C-alpha cells in the first residue's frame, strides 16, 4: 500500500505544478492552463531529438540522471508514506547537495557563457543558504534531544506541543520556507519562467540543454519542490498524523500540499524579484534569528 501511495504521488507531481501555475494565473488575471499541460510539455520534450556537442564530456550524460536519482531519493526518504524508514536528517540534505553539485558540473561542462554564469550564481546562492540550512538541522536535532532521525524529530514535536515549542517551530517553518524558495529557484530569489540574462540562475544553467535532458531536469526540479513541501509538512505541520496508512490520511496529505503550494503562489505573486546581492541580507537575518532562538531555548 505504501508503494502505491508513493507511485501516486509521483504521478500527481505534474498536477501539483499545474495547480501552482494556475493559482498564479488567476491572481494575475491570466487564462488558466489545462490540468494536463505539464504532462503534454514533458511528453513533447521527450519526443524531441537529442543533440550532443563534441566539446562536452560524460558529465553531460551523467548529470541529468544523477539529478533525477537524487530527487527521487530525496522524495522517497521523507517518511510520509514509509513507516519503517528512519533516515538521518543530515544524510537527507547531503543527498540534495549532491544533485546541486552535479547540476553545476553539468552547466560548466557545456562550456558556454550562460552555463558558467548560472553555475557561479547557483554556487553563490547555495553558499549563502548553507549556514541557514545547517542551523535548521541543528535546531531540529536540539529540539529532539539530539536525535538526528526524522521519525524521532517528528515524534518529539507531536508530543511536546507547548506554546514555547510551537513558537520555535514557527521560526523553523519560516526558515524552511525560505530554504524551499531558494533551493528550488523560486521568487524572490529566481524567476523560473524568465530568460533575462541579468536575473536568471536556474534557466541559465539549462539554456543550452537539448530536449530529452531538459525533460529529465525539469522533472527533477518539480520532484524537488514537492519533496521540500513534504519535508515541511512532516517536520512542521505534522500535528495529527505522521504516517499515511489510509486513503483518508492520503487525502489530508494532498490537502496540505495544495495549501502550501497556494501559499507559495500568493507569496510569489505579491513579491518582486530580489537583487542577487541582497540575498545575503535575507539569509543573514534568518541566521541571526535562528541563533537567537536557539540561545533562548538552551537557556530557558
Go through each PLM region and give its residues.
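Alpha-helical transmembrane segments
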Residues: 2-13, 85-97, 130, 161-183, ...
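Transmembrane alpha-helical segments that form the membrane-embedded catalytic/substrate-channel core
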Residues: 14-23, 100-107, 173-191, 261-270
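Alpha-helical transmembrane segments of helical membrane proteins, especially in multi-pass transport
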Residues: 203-206, 210-248, 256-265
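Juxtamembrane inter-helical linkers in multi-pass membrane proteins
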Residues: 25-46, 190-212
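Juxtamembrane/interfacial segments at transmembrane-helix boundaries in multi-pass membrane proteins
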Residues: 137-171
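Juxtamembrane boundary at the C-terminal end of a transmembrane helix
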Residues: 292-300
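Cytosolic juxtamembrane amphipathic/interface segments immediately preceding
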Residues: 41-59, 113-117, 206-212
Amino acid at each position: 500500500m505504501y508503494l502505491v501511495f508513493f507511485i501516486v504521488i509521483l504521478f500527481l507531481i505534474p498536477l501539483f505544478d499545474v495547480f501552482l501555475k494556475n493559482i498564479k494565473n488567476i491572481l494575475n488575471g491570466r487564462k488558466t492552463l489545462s490540468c494536463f499541460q505539464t504532462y503534454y510539455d514533458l511528453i513533447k520534450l521527450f519526443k524531441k531529438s537529442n543533440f550532443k556537442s563534441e566539446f562536452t564530456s560524460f558529465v553531460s550524460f551523467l548529470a541529468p540522471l544523477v539529478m533525477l536519482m537524487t530527487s527521487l531519493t530525496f522524495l522517497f526518504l521523507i517518511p510520509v508514506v514509509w513507516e519503517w524508514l528512519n533516515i538521518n536528517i543530515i544524510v537527507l540534505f547531503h543527498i540534495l547537495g549532491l544533485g546541486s553539485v552535479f547540476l553545476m558540473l553539468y552547466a560548466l561542462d557545456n562550456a558556454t557563457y550562460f552555463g558558467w554564469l548560472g553555475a557561479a550564481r547557483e554556487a553563490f546562492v547555495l553558499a549563502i543558504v548553507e549556514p541557514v540550512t545547517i542551523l535548521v538541522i541543528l535546531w531540529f536535532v536540539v529540539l529532539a534531544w539530539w536525535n538526528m532521525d526524522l521519525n524521532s524529530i517528528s515524534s518529539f514535536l507531536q508530543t511536546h506541543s507547548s506554546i514555547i515549542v510551537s513558537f520555535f517551530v514557527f521560526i523553523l517553518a519560516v526558515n524552511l520556507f525560505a530554504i524551499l524558495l531558494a533551493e528550488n529557484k523560486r521568487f524572490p530569489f529566481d524567476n523560473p519562467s524568465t530568460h533575462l540574462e541579468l536575473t536568471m540562475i536556474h534557466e541559465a544553467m539549462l539554456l543550452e540543454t537539448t530536449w530529452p535532458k531538459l525533460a529529465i531536469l525539469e522533472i527533477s526540479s518539480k520532484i524537488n519542490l514537492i519533496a521540500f513541501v513534504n519535508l515541511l509538512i512532516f517536520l512542521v505541520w505534522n500535528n495529527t498524523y505522521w504516517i499515511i496508512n489510509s486513503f483518508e490520511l492520503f487525502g489530508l496529505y494532498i490537502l496540505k500540499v495544495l495549501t502550501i503550494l497556494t501559499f507559495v503562489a500568493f507569496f510569489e505573486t505579491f513579491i518582486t524579484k530580489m537583487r542577487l546581492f541582497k540575498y545575503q541580507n535575507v539569509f543573514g537575518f534568518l541566521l541571526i534569528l535562528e541563533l537567537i532562538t536557539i540561545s533562548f531555548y538552551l537557556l530557558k
